[in-house]
Amino acid sequence: MANPIKIGIGGPVGAGKTQLIEKVVKRLSKEMSIGVITNDIYTKEDEKILVNSGVLPESRIIGVETGGCPHTAIREDASMNFAAIDELLERHDDIELIFIESGGDNLAATFSPELVDFSIYIIDVAQGEKIPRKGGQGMIKSDFFVINKTDLAPYVGASLEQMAEDTKVFRDKRPFTFTNLKTDEGLDEVIDWIKRDTLLKGLS
């Protein structure tokens, strides 16, 4: 049975978690075997979105209904997600990479290191310029940080330069990037990081 790399995708509701997974999987699935687990509180809406997108066969996507606080299912009691991983591997024992999308949560949400090997935390510009300055644990501790929806900056009065400076203060040298996932702007940086830092591709 495979021992896949597991990458957690966290962030507030509407930041672009599902869209990020859809875009990344569309690219990487040409090169490797991938599975996805989505977490929603009372529905399997994100699972349906990914299935309808056609980026993966339905059998490679599992939706988990967490109930209650979404961060509990990715940190304190991740048993439902562990079970979903086992089910994915029973269906497809060649899976090399699994994305685990958390339910929409606050800036403090982090993944259990027993559940994932790496994590990406995504916010969007529309939430306000001050978000990186708040220094939530999701942003600080994630292995890669994404600030999405850069196209909205002029409409909400957000300075991308200030957001970058604030991010550097809290993340030090940990990588981050800006994206506009509607146009794929910044997507290459995310994929390059995944290949280089999690899959160790291109290293010699």
Swiss-Prot record:
Tell me the GO molecular function terms. Answer: GTP binding; GTPase activity; nickel cation binding
Recorded superkingdom: Bacteria
Keyword tags: Chaperone, Cytoplasm, GTP-binding, Nickel insertion, Nucleotide-binding
SUPFAM superfamilies in the record, alphabetically? Answer: P-loop containing nucleoside triphosphate hydrolases
Question: Which InterPro entries does the record match to this protein?
Answer: CobW/HypB/UreG_nucleotide-bd, P-loop_NTPase, UreG
Residues bound to GTP are G11, P12, V13, G14, A15, G16, K17, T18
What is the protein's known function?
Answer: Facilitates the functional incorporation of the urease nickel metallocenter. This process requires GTP hydrolysis, probably effectuated by UreG.
Q: Would you tell me the protein name for this molecule?
A: Urease accessory protein UreG
